[in-house]
Amino acid sequence: MYHCFRLRRGQDLYEEIEAYVKAHHIAAGAVVSGVGCVSRWRLRDATGVRVRSGEEDVEIVSLMGTVSEYGCHLHASFSREDLSAFGGHLLPGCTVTVSYT
């Protein structure tokens, strides 16, 4: 079964994905793609220790991971206006500013 949904300006990217999974009783699944922009981002590195965050308009260039009734494990990559890219483990605190149709 496939699911596709759109988020609105001001929603939290991570929390809305997690809420969708719970609301639709998805026991296990995968996020294979996501597009749009966020104005606030929050990521964790692979060690699980360092958390980085920022407030700037960045574009989602990659969004993938696993989802389940026990939680989400999502990776995101973002691109800045100068086209530099960065990414990590997606955390709550990423505010959607633009979503595409």
For the regions a language model picked out, list residue spans one by one.
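Short amphipathic
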Residues: M1-R9
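Conserved small/polar residues in nucleotide/adenosyl-binding loops
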Residues: T101
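Short, intrinsically disordered, mixed-charge
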Residues: E15, A19-A27, R80-S84, L91-P92, ...
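Mid-chain, well-packed structural core segment of small domains
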Residues: R52-C94
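Short glycine/serine/threonine-biased micro-segments
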Residues: R8, V32-G34, L63, A85-F86
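Short, well-structured hydrophobic secondary-structure segments
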Residues: D12-G54
